[in-house]
Curated annotation (Swiss-Prot):
GO terms for molecular function: lytic endotransglycosylase activity. GO terms for biological process: cell wall macromolecule catabolic process; cell wall organization; peptidoglycan metabolic process. It is found in: Cell outer membrane. The gene is emtA. SUPFAM superfamilies: Lysozyme-like. This is Endo-type membrane-bound lytic murein transglycosylase A. Its EC number is 4.2.2.n2. Pfam families: SLT (PF01464). Residues 1-15 form the signal peptide.
């Protein structure tokens, strides 16, 4: 009986630890970052226009597309920053005062894609994530929200946005990452933060 309980405990602990092992498999950022860096002049221009760190833009390009402007995902996310026309693309169009959504050819255009990606990061920062005080925590919140939606992130803290932001402001960057790893419904959420750090270190 004791042996059976011990075996169960080992399995339970293994399950808990594997849930948070978002660094496996390891991700080598060197080549994706090198390819993403070729777009740095555009990233700097878009970053200046929208108040977004061009290194953050470059890291997202490395993670999302590996620097390939023609990349198209199974979910129809398109281009360097893997934007979806019907969601993030439509949000950017609305911010610009335009109707409709971007075309596939527009999203495959490096300058337009990076500009819209930077605009979307600005929408997240000044909208649902407004009020986050720690710059590193904000950076982590931005990439998790960029990949999986701001609502999914905030709901792991509270259904009330203001309360969620207040709880986020009680955490430092490491505590925020741990919270995401333990509570976010998308397994790729903490892994995105891991990849972000790998990409920034490779620049």
């Amino acid at each position: 009986m004791k042996l059976r309980w011990f075996a169960f405990l080992i399995v339970l602990l293994a399950g808990c630890s594997s849930k948070h092992d978002y660094t496996n498999p390891p991700w080598n950022a060197k080549v994706p970052v090198q390819r993403a860096m070729q777009w740095m002049p555009i990233s700097q221009k878009a970053g200046a226009a929208w108040g977004v760190d061009p290194q953050l833009i470059t890291a997202i390009i490395a993670i999302e597309s590996g620097g390939n402007p023609n990349a198209v995902s199974k979910s129809n996310a398109i281009g360097l920053m893997q934007l979806k026309a019907s969601t993030s693309g439509r949000d950017v169009y609305r911010r610009m005062g335009w109707s409709g959504e971007p075309t596939t050819s527009e999203l495959k255009n490096p300058e337009r894609n990076i500009s819209m990606g930077a605009a979307y990061l600005n929408i997240l920062e000044t909208g649902p994530l407004a009020g986050i005080e720690d710059p590193k925590v904000l950076q982590y919140a931005l990439v998790v929200s960029y990949a999986n939606g701001a609502g999914a992130l905030l709901r792991t803290f509270s259904s009330d946005r203001k309360k969620a932001i207040s709880k986020i402001n009680d955490l430092d960057a490491d505590e925020f990452l741990d919270h995401v790893a333990r509570n976010h419904p998308a397994p790729q959420a903490p892994r995105y933060i891991y990849k972000l750090e790998q990409a920034l270190d490779a620049m």
